[in-house]
From Swiss-Prot:
Family in the record: Belongs to the UPF0248 family.
Superkingdom as given in the UniProt entry: Archaea
Protein's organism: Methanocaldococcus jannaschii (strain ATCC 43067 / DSM 2661 / JAL-1 / JCM 10045 / NBRC 100440)
Name the UniProt record assigns to this protein: UPF0248 protein MJ1316
Length: 80
């Protein structure tokens, strides 16, 4: 799955009425964090172009390692 598929998944979560952003989180590559990974609720970010905006931080989409449903544990995207 490339960036195109990743953006499709994110757009669906952000804009489709059947999905709630607060039910999902992204795991990103975050150097210095435990195992260099950090989980962020999609309710706390904005999607702008090829970036997630988390407060004042721009996170390039290529840093997303995983998208998962917090309630069910379902993994919608996992970087190879």
């Amino acid at each position: 799955m490339g960036i195109f598929m990743l953006k499709e998944i994110l757009n669906k979560i952000f804009w489709h009425p059947d999905y709630k952003r607060e039910d999902f989180e992204v795991v990103i590559l975050h150097r210095g964090a435990e195992e260099n990974k950090k989980a962020i609720s999609l309710d706390d970010v904005e999607l702008k172009g090829n970036y997630l905006i988390y407060f004042d931080t721009y996170i390039p989409l290529h840093r997303i390692l995983e998208i998962r449903n917090k309630k069910t544990g379902e993994i919608l995207y996992k970087k190879k």
